[in-house]
């Protein structure tokens, strides 16, 4: 029986002429385990829906732009379309309308497992449907069958200096995979633009399948003296194969990776990595080049390095106060950090105004599997004392923890202690969201991105300011 689901979604507009409404949707998921065939049925309907929507409301304003927005990283400007996820300031991320707790409940799991399989989330992101277990199993097998790396990429990875940052190695390897791009080949042969999405889909599926192999090879070469990663097991899921290739056999760690790869997969379209993939893809660059560009953005300290900064700060606190520090001593350390002009890493978010649900689900995992771990207990104490202090300070819009306040602690517990590698894990996960979006970018025929820029003099003239 095809899976049916009814849910409500609040649709609001900044324009006063468009009143908020509650709409009820019924989603009938196909029984087919052929993901491309499922998409082939959905895409024409969505193309028609968007066409009609633009025809009727194309000239309708959805927001305003201030001078501060232009100088402030375009924060808050509504300028992108992203179908896969929406970030609610109060509820956190919703993947195709589903919150993280809802995804944990309805997405298929591994036998005996409690966390959702990332394959299921990818199916949800790219189709909008909650998949069946059979569909997820088929996707696991398909990715296993597509996972082999071409020999030139293996040679390249094995000849990179082990001192080269893992993210640089990832970017190089993904760029080199462009040699195998089915989309680039089809484009050069003059394929019709209505077929672009099919080849972007093929490249995206190949890339997602190969990323754990690339990432595991980087890990083994850089931190394990080049020990082989072994072969992909077609009977295992994507995360299980990844952890096995990394060299970890602990089933709890595999469960953690399933959770980690799910919750880091997507976060709307405006963050640096997602926007970069969309931007580069809008020039009709293939998925390999687009994703590599996104990974170069993710490698930046302000985007993908936050959980490392949290760990460094925690280790500093632990070294100074010890494992059993009292709440009062932790409070004193927090105040000392703030008074020195630094921030408390892992707290606050550009959009969220409550505790990040990605933090919450990791905390629940820790409470279940490692409640007595000293580093986790320290994180728990910090969770108690930091929000009231930041609230008292009065300068912070969001005093609550984000995803980065917790992820590094869990990885450390299970023995993956190489902090420079953490962003690679983030990148493997983020592929699920950004590549699902890239397929839809081409399916909807979105044009090359080309916003208008202005000089300071031009802005001053536009607003009537004196120079």
Curated annotation (Swiss-Prot):
Record localization: Mitochondrion matrix
GO molecular function, one term: citrate (Si)-synthase activity
Record-linked CDD domains: ScCit1-2_like
GO BP, sorted A to Z: carbohydrate metabolic process; citrate metabolic process; tricarboxylic acid cycle
Pathway linked to the protein: Carbohydrate metabolism; tricarboxylic acid cycle; isocitrate from oxaloacetate: step 1/2
Keyword terms of this UniProt record: Mitochondrion, Transferase, Transit peptide, Tricarboxylic acid cycle
Catalysed reaction, written as an equation: oxaloacetate + acetyl-CoA + H2O = citrate + CoA + H(+)
Record InterPro entries: Citrate_synth-like_lrg_a-sub (IPR016142), Citrate_synth-like_sm_a-sub (IPR016143), Citrate_synthase (IPR002020), Citrate_synthase_AS (IPR019810), Citrate_synthase_euk (IPR010109), Citrate_synthase_sf (IPR036969)
Residues forming the catalytic site: 303, 349, 404
Example of a GO cellular component annotation carried by this entry: mitochondrial matrix
Keyword flag Mitochondrion: yes
Pfam families in alphabetical order: Citrate_synt
EC number(s) per entry: 2.3.3.16
Predominant location category: mitochondrion
Entry similarity comment: Belongs to the citrate synthase family.
The protein's assembly and partners: Homodimer.
Stated name of the protein: Probable citrate synthase 1, mitochondrial
Organism per entry: Aedes aegypti
